Regions:
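Hydrophobic alpha-helical transmembrane segments of multi-pass integral membrane proteins
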Residues: 1-226
Length: 226
């Protein structure tokens, strides 16, 4: 149910933003139908096709987001907007991998870990990293955005270590899985520390601003779209 809550929250926000793009109405209805199908999968027991229903719906939701979401627009821009766009698209790929695991690896000895890690680490944390440059100023009421090109280093390390963690789990390489799991956890902490350091550095360098976080969010969204 936590997976369902986060999925509906994130996808609902992306669906709302899609109104600013020329997205056909049929595709929006299709996404709503896929979310309804995912809900059915949550209700049906996992041993009675529940996992498979959630898996196929998660895979198709990921495909919808890759095709229709504004991330494809942002990824063609520069600096932080490229970071946001690529981060979102990678998150959607993780959602697709999550769906594939639900459909095909339900009997694996580490299936529970694979399901949790692909969703909560792969999909959810990718969403956090991608939204941070616009959402964090809104949350903390500041103008400074937590973006610097150095974030690409830890972001890439996080994604690669998580991918290695998933592959080593599937192959039952427990020692490698353990090492990559520790690295993955530290990279999450480092990413947050870097973001905090970037904000503090920008505040000390340029001072505070009276511009509200909500205004930053609105301007950021406009820049992504135009």
């Amino acid at each position: 149910w936590w997976i369902g809550f986060l999925l509906f929250t994130i996808v609902g926000e992306r669906l709302e933003l899609s109104q600013f793009l020329p997205v056909p109405s049929w595709s929006q209805n299709a996404l709503k139908s896929l979310l309804a199908l995912f809900t059915v999968g949550l209700i049906v027991p996992f041993h009675a096709w529940g996992n498979e229903i959630m898996g196929i719906s998660a895979l198709l939701i990921a495909a919808w987001l890759l095709v229709f979401d504004m991330a494809k627009v942002a990824s063609r821009k520069a600096a932080q907007f490229r970071y946001i766009g690529i981060g979102l698209q990678v998150g959607y790929l993780w959602l697709g991998i999550h769906g594939l695991i639900l459909m095909g690896l339900g009997n694996h000895s580490l299936s529970y870990a694979l399901i949790l890690h692909t969703f909560f680490l792969g999909f959810t944390f990718s969403m956090i990293w991608a939204h941070a440059p616009i959402i964090f100023p809104t949350i903390f009421g500041i103008r400074q955005t937590p973006y610097h090109p150095v974030l690409w280093i830890t972001w890439t390390g996080f994604q690669l270590s998580l991918l290695g963690r998933i592959v080593s789990s599937i192959l039952d390489e427990y020692e490698l899985r353990k090492v990559l799991g520790v690295a993955n956890g530290y990279l999450i902490l480092i990413q947050f520390v870097l973001m905090a350091g970037i904000i503090i550095g920008k505040i000390m360098k340029g001072g505070t601003s009276s511009q509200s976080g909500n205004k930053i969010y609105r301007e950021g969204r406009k820049k992504i779209l135009h």
